Amino acid sequence: MIPIQLSVFFMIIYVLESLTIIVQSSLIVAVLGREWLQIRRLMPVDMILISLGISRFCLQWTSMLNDFCFYFNFNYVLCNLTITWTFFNVLTFWLNSLLTVFYCIKVSSFTHPIVLWLRWRILRWLPWLLLGCLMITCVTIIPSAIGNYIQIQFLTMEHPPRNSTVIDRLQKFHQYLHQAHTVALVIPFILFLASTILLMASLTKQIQHHGTGHCNPSMKAHFTALRSLAILFIVFTSYFLTILITMIGTLFDKRCWLWVWEAFVYAFIFMHSTSLMLSSPTLKRILNGKC
């Protein structure tokens, strides 16, 4: 049990972090959206960033509402928000993975025929890849939608079933949903991890070839991408730690430690959002007043 004053302090920190992330996401969407309206085209990385900005904007608002409903025991509202949070959470994971794969293909110095083939075609495929992320997300949240519907029906029953067999089946079904949601996040994480390793290998190869004294555009591109990927790796790891804490949540009061953990996790998300903004040449040019 932590003091109420400390909980309030971390709650305020979490709200400030969330509002900052919302402003950052809004800025990404507004700036890149204006650029698209003016010139009727966007750089490929900006297409991913504007999709990620929209997803993260919706995710952050849903996350705030979800956390406060959990903390204050608004169970019925929580059930309705959970499916929305799950959708934008999975979509954000897939968009982040797509961004890392794009960086890996376009920035790496590998000359393997498969890499060259992908590098030539990924620009044409990008709109379809974004649509694919959306479709995969819709499919993967179907079990969660079914589970939330059952839970809402259970909460609204005037006389809930007391049969232990029914309750056990519901508990097993929720365990299955938890595992399905974890798998839906593990797959994009593996894609992200593979892309990161390949980029690191490419950077090492470049350093060995050119020496540490040279700083060509390719090296700068590597460092920019790896800066974003390093922070994103911390975010992914932090999120999996939250899943682990949820699984062993009987050891402590999750509601008591909610704001401490959320403030910790969203500090990394804030850093990643900032890094993403700096990784876009269009955003850097406009924000620096060089448009």
From Swiss-Prot:
What the entry lists under InterPro entries is as follows:
TAS2R (IPR007960)
Q: What is this protein for, i.e. what is its function?
A: Receptor that may play a role in the perception of bitterness and is gustducin-linked. May play a role in sensing the chemical composition of the gastrointestinal content. The activity of this receptor may stimulate alpha gustducin, mediate PLC-beta-2 activation and lead to the gating of TRPM5.
Among PANTHER family, the record links this protein to: TASTE RECEPTOR TYPE 2, TASTE RECEPTOR TYPE 2 MEMBER 16
Positions in the Extracellular compartment? 1, 63-84, 147-182, 250-257
Transmembrane feature ranges:
2-22, 42-62, 85-105, 126-146, 183-203, 229-249, 258-278
Q: What is its main location?
A: membrane
The source organism is: Papio hamadryas
**What does the sequence similarity comment in the record state about its family?**
Belongs to the G-protein coupled receptor T2R family.
Q: What else is known?
A: Most taste cells may be activated by a limited number of bitter compounds; individual taste cells can discriminate among bitter stimuli.
- Kindly give the membrane topology term recorded for this protein: Multi-pass membrane protein
Per UniProt, which keywords does this protein have? Cell membrane, G-protein coupled receptor, Glycoprotein, Membrane, Receptor, Sensory transduction, Taste, Transducer, Transmembrane, Transmembrane helix
State which ranges are Cytoplasmic (membrane side).
23-41, 106-125, 204-228, 279-291
Give compartment(s): Cell membrane
Q: Name one GO molecular function term.
A: bitter taste receptor activity
Under what name is this protein listed? Taste receptor type 2 member 16
